[in-house]
Amino acid sequence: MHKRIKNIKYAVVTVSDSRYNDLIKGKEVDDKSGKLLKKELNAKVYTIIPDNKNMIKGIVEHIVEFFDVDCIVFTGGTGIAERDVTVEALKEIIEKELDGFKIIFQKLSYEEVGFSAMLSRAMAGIYKGKIIYALPGSVNACRTALKIIKEETGHILGHLREG
């Protein structure tokens, strides 16, 4: 039996050109999804970065190296627009993809939004013993994903730590 890890330490990263531009201009940032995830997961790290593959990969490396977290949750950049590169960036570095997350997330999303769920490219994977989730930028999608994340992250970590 795998031990379910408790007291999980999270980092939350919002990927959005517009929110990042507001941040660097000193404007108020309207990041409902990132703030929801930060609050619900009691995240120890929270940041906003632009839609840029190198920045996405770099922030993963930075968080893994300098912060004691078990899980990094990205929101934004998972759509089908040209600038949506979160999934592509993460797929370049993750060691194992957790395909079941995408399947379950799409099923739950379909129950809420119908066929529009097919536009979601949410994903999860493992990198250096950490779980990485990539979620859409919408608040409703993040709420849906939180059901899965809160329920299963401790179980996944138990498997990872068992070796």
Curated annotation (Swiss-Prot):
Q: Pfam families of this UniProt entry?
A: MoCF_biosynth
GO terms under cellular component: cytosol
Q: State the reactions this protein catalyses.
A: molybdopterin + ATP + H(+) = adenylyl-molybdopterin + diphosphate
Which Cys residues form disulphide pairs?
Answer: none
Q: Where does the signal sequence lie?
A: none
Q: Which NCBIfam families match?
A: molyb_syn (TIGR00177)
Identify this protein by name: Probable molybdopterin adenylyltransferase
What species was this sequence derived from? Answer: Methanocaldococcus jannaschii (strain ATCC 43067 / DSM 2661 / JAL-1 / JCM 10045 / NBRC 100440) (Methanococcus jannaschii)
Q: What is the lineage of its organism?
A: Archaea, Methanobacteriati, Methanobacteriota, Methanomada group, Methanococci
Gene that produces this protein: moaB
